[in-house]
């Protein structure tokens, strides 16, 4: 296994007497986008929490460029399924809160880093808005900006677009691809949407079994930047191949 990028080895993870993950070996290359799919309860979100340093009671290790990661690391960002914005802070302060909790809202609005990120997610005019004034898609854009504030090398996302409508989901998917291309970070995404996994990813990994392990991995030889119309046939074929693999594995 190469020492470049993010490496994960999980010999086992238990909750009480129940083993939820076993024999997981996963590497995420610099700039690579990988999706994790699998049935509910197979351990996908637990795997992300281990990588994020939020779950430490497991047998195995996480490493970045060969150096072991212990606990929460500023080089690894995490985007939750829900935006989880602080309701008493405006948009700018929520973005800066990722690393500068003591920064005043006024100072956050003047921060060049905050302004850059809000411009990149299309919310520069919403810097003074409170979370209750945002749509679901706008709130998740703020969460993306907050996740990038520390300039992570790896971004973990746990079903980040599942709570928004289909049109907003498409826009957020394209935004994620654009941000990943501009910033050069790697992405590990948990999703139940096969079309989303195929469109976004360089690889799709299927977690299956009880306890969960890597049941299948499929590399997607599709060019970047992705284009839904120009690559429609290739995306459709990749989806069919993945569905065939899932049916043969009886994962869902």
Curated annotation (Swiss-Prot):
EC supergroup of this enzyme: translocase
Name the record gives this protein: Aliphatic sulfonates import ATP-binding protein SsuB 1
GO cellular component, one term: plasma membrane
Binding site for ATP: 38-45
Family named by the database record: Belongs to the ABC transporter superfamily. Aliphatic sulfonates importer (TC 3.A.1.17.2) family.
UniProt xrefs under InterPro entries: AAA+_ATPase, ABC_transporter-like_ATP-bd, ABC_transporter-like_CS, ABC_transporter_ATP-bind, P-loop_NTPase
Positions of the ABC transporter domain: 6-234
Recorded catalytic activity of this chain's protein: ATP + H2O + aliphatic sulfonate-[sulfonate-binding protein]Side 1 = ADP + phosphate + aliphatic sulfonateSide 2 + [sulfonate-binding protein]Side 1
Protein's organism: Xanthomonas axonopodis pv. citri (strain 306)
Gene: ssuB1
Oligomeric and partner information: The complex is composed of two ATP-binding proteins (SsuB), two transmembrane proteins (SsuC) and a solute-binding protein (SsuA).
Cellular location(s): Cell inner membrane
């Amino acid at each position: 296994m190469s020492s470049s990028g993010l490496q994960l080895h999980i010999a086992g993870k238990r909750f009480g007497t129940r083993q939820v993950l076993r024999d997981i070996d996963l590497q995420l290359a610099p700039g690579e986008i990988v999706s994790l799919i699998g049935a509910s309860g197979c351990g996908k979100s637990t795997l992300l929490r281990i990588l994020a340093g939020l779950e430490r009671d497991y047998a195995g290790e996480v490493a970045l460029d060969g150096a072991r990661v212990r606990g929460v690391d500023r080089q690894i960002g995490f985007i939750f399924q829900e935006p989880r914005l602080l309701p008493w802070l405006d948009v700018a302060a929520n973005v800066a809160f990722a690393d500068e909790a003591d920064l005043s809202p006024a100072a956050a609005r003047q921060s060049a880093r905050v302004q850059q990120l809000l411009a990149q997610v299309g919310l520069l005019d919403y810097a003074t808005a409170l979370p209750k004034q945002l749509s679901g898609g706008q709130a998740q854009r703020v969460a993306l900006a907050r996740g990038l504030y520390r300039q992570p090398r790896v971004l973990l996302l746990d079903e980040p677009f599942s709570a928004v409508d289909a049109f907003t989901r498409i826009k957020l998917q394209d935004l994620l691809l654009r941000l990943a291309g501009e910033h050069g970070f790697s992405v590990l995404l948990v999703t139940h949407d096969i079309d989303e996994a195929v469109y976004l990813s360089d690889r799709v990994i299927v977690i299956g079994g009880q306890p969960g392990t890597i049941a299948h991995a499929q590399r997607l030889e599709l060019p970047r930047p992705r284009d839904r119309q120009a690559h429609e046939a290739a995306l459709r074929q990749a989806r069919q191949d993945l569905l065939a693999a899932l049916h043969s594995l009886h994962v869902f």
